[in-house]
Curated annotation (Swiss-Prot):
The lineage of its organism: Eukaryota, Fungi, Dikarya, Ascomycota, Saccharomycotina. GO terms for biological process: response to arsenic-containing substance. This is Arsenical-resistance protein 2. Residues 17-124 form the Rhodanese domain. InterPro entries: Rhodanese-like_dom, Rhodanese-like_dom_sf. It comes from the Eukaryota. SMART domains: RHOD (SM00450).
Amino acid sequence: MVSFITSRQLKGLIENQRKDFQVVDLRREDFARDHITNAWHVPVTAQITEKQLNQLIKGLSDTFSSSQFVKVIFHCTGSKNRGPKVAAKFETYLQEEDITSKFESCILVGGFYAWETHCRESNLKLIVSG
C-alpha cells in the first residue's frame, strides 16, 4: 500500500539524518534549478518506464543494505499526477517481486510546491539550488 508523508515529517527525517529513506524527484527540467537535499532525479513525463524502474531498484539495492527497510518518497511538482502514478507502479513492482519487506512506496503530500512553501515558512535551508 502506498503511504503519504508530509513536508514536516520529511523535514524531521532529514534533520535527524535518518539513513532509511530516499527522496525521488520526478520533475523533468525543474530538478536542475532546485531540489530537496540528497534527492535522486528520475525525470518522468507521464509514467516511469520499465528501464527507469529497474535502474531505480538497482540504485536502491546498491545504496542501502539488504537488511535495511527503506522508505522511497516520490514527488513531482504538486504530487497530484506523476508522483502518485509512479508510487503506485513502484508499489505494484514491489508486490510482484515480493520485496515489500524491503521498501515502502510513499508520496510527498503537495509535492515540491508544498516542500518549498514549508521551507520558506520555516526559514529552512533544505533545498539545493542549481
